Amino acid sequence: MIHQQTEIRIPVGSVKVEGTLTLPSGAKGVVLFAHGSGSSRFSTRNQYVAKEFNKSALGTLLFDLLTAEEEETDVLTAEFRFNIPLLASRLIGVTEWLRNDPKTKNMAFGYFGASTGAAAALIAAAKLPGEVAAVVSRGGRPDFAGKYLASVVAPTLLLVGGLDTEVIELNEQAMEQMTSEKKLVIIPGATHLFEEPGKLEEVAKFSIDWFLRYLR
């Protein structure tokens, strides 16, 4: 399968964020990755999942929610990593940019969020009800989305490791507040980062099935 891959800089508010847009031939949808704190678009886990998506004709955009300068500051002060409204606003800005780009303007969009990035994805989905076709949360903290959970209309898949007991409970509580179609899948034997053999492959499989169902 032929992929068209482009390094892009997207203006969002007063800054520009950097990303990698990959569009396989025949792609009808694009999945935007919202990474968690301390991660980036170069994360080996997200890179692996993105490649699996591409093999299934799903486009992907891996981008950094923070600028390089903000990342440097965050390492020292942690002032940005839990600023979920800021992260959500960046995701919204990037989504709107894709909607206006000739290559992607007619495609369906999905969000793949990890850890705190999942909360940002859910807030963005709540604020863009007509734009986001589906959301997948990997080891996410949907509880950080707070009051916005009830406003999410996009079908949402919550993936949590079976050994990540605290996060399982938080996801169960968040599900109770959601009125959209939602599903919680607990992956046995997996911890928070799904580092155990074969567990990230399961994440990719469940996610691909979900996105292919809704990104049309």
Where are these regions (language model features)?
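Gly/Ala-rich beta-loop-alpha elbow adjacent to hydrolase catalytic centers
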Residues: G113-A121
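Catalytic histidine neighborhood in serine/cysteine hydrolases
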Residues: M178-L193
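A conserved short beta-strand
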Residues: G130-P142
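Serine-hydrolase catalytic machinery in alpha/beta-hydrolase-like enzymes
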Residues: I8-M107, G198, E202-V203
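Short beta-strand/loop motif that positions the catalytic acidic residue
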Residues: V152, L158-V160
